[in-house]
Structures are given as C-alpha cells and as structure tokens.
C-alpha cells in the first residue's frame, strides 16, 4: 500500500511541472488565435466592401478606359469624368478667347461633349470647377459627312469637264476657221485662173 502511494506521489511530482506549462501555453495561444481570426475576418470584410464599391462604380460608369472597345462610334471617352460622352454639334473653330485652352491648342477646332452626371460627389465638384460644358479637340474632316464629300468631288469633276469641253470647242473653232480661210483662198485662186483662161480663149 505504501509502495502504491509512493508511486502515485512520484508520478504526481513528475507530472506537476508539465501541467502548468501546457495550461499556460493554451492560455497564451488562445488570444493569439482569436486575434488572428479577428484579423482574417476584418480583411475578408474589407475585401468584400472593396468588391462592392468596385461593382457599384463599374455599374455607374460601365465605359471606363479599360472598356473603350465598348464605346460606340458616336461617343467618346472623357478622361476627366471617366465616362463615355456624346458628341454634340459640329467641329467649330475656337474663338479667340479660347485659343489657349487645352482643347484648342492642338487643332484650333473644338467639339462639345455631353457627358452623363456621375453619382460621385467629389467627381461632380471637380467637374464643376472645370469648364462647363466640356469640349474635345477636333478637325473639320472629322465631322464632314461622306455624302457631302462625294457631292463636292462630283461638282469639281463636272466643272473640270465643262472647262475642258469649252477649251476643246475653242480649239476646234480656231482650226476650222483657218481651214475655211485656206479653202476660200484656193477657191478664189481657182476662180481667177478659170476667168483668166476664159478671157484668153475668147481672144
């Protein structure tokens, strides 16, 4: 009996140093695990919020620079607002007061842009501080219709044809008049010769 108690006491004494160490480790590891889980949870929430914001931004402005291939031919990308704006009116010459503007320096012509309103308040404030309405540089050839160009080409060709026909007629008249003069002179010479021979025969 004493041997059993002694053995139990030895076992308890032998295991005693390890029990608090393991418990302290478990106590020390528990807050770290909770902190890690909390950080992972917060990062997941932040990622989800970023995705939602990007999704809303893309839905409000679906035609960004990366989606320029989706912009229709009658629309143009505006780098200021990040939106696809419609072209308004024709390409007009810049007035003297706007010659130094960025949209007039390149070609001296400008075309108005009609851009949709953004839901971003900061962006709206930025756009209001800039020129309103907005313009883009252009050249008169950008807005010329193909039909108008064809009509102008046909008119020029018709004018050249009329001029060439007139010149040709004048040249023909000159040649014909000189030919008629030569013909008349020959006829006169023939008449004179025939009259002279007739006079000789009568003699």
Swiss-Prot record:
Keywords: Glycoprotein, Host cytoplasm, Secreted, Signal, Virulence
Residues the record marks as carrying a glycan: 32, 193
Keyword Metal-binding: no
Superkingdom: Eukaryota
Keyword DNA repair: no
Localization (cell): Secreted; Host cytoplasm
Induction info: Expression is up-regulated during the late plant infection stages.
Cellular-component GO terms for this entry: extracellular region; host cell cytoplasm
Similarity remark: Belongs to the RxLR effector family.
Annotated protein name in UniProt: Secreted RxLR effector protein RXLR-C28
Record lineage: Eukaryota, Sar, Stramenopiles, Oomycota, Peronosporales
């Amino acid at each position: 009996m004493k041997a059993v108690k002694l053995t139990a006491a030895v076992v308890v004494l032998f295991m005693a140093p390890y029990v608090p160490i393991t418990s302290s480790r478990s106590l020390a590891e528990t807050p770290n695990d909770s902190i890690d889980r909390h950080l992972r949870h917060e990062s997941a929430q932040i990622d989800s919020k970023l995705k939602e914001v990007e999704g809303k931004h893309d839905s409000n402005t679906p035609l960004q620079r990366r989606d320029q291939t989706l912009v229709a031919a009658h629309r143009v990308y505006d780098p200021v607002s990040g939106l696809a704006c419609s072209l308004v009116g024709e390409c007009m010459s810049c007035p003297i007061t706007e010659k130094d503007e960025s949209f007039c320096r390149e070609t001296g012509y400008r075309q108005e842009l009609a851009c949709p309103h953004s839901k971003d308040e900061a962006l709206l404030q930025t756009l209001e501080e800039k020129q309103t309405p907005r313009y883009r540089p252009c050249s008169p050839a950008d807005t010329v219709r193909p039909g108008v160009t064809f009509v102008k080409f046909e008119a020029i060709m018709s004018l050249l044809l009329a001029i060439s026909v007139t010149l040709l007629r004048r040249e023909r008249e000159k040649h014909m008049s000189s030919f008629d003069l030569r013909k008349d002179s020959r006829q006169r010479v023939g008449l004179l010769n025939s009259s002279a021979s007739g006079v000789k025969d009568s003699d």
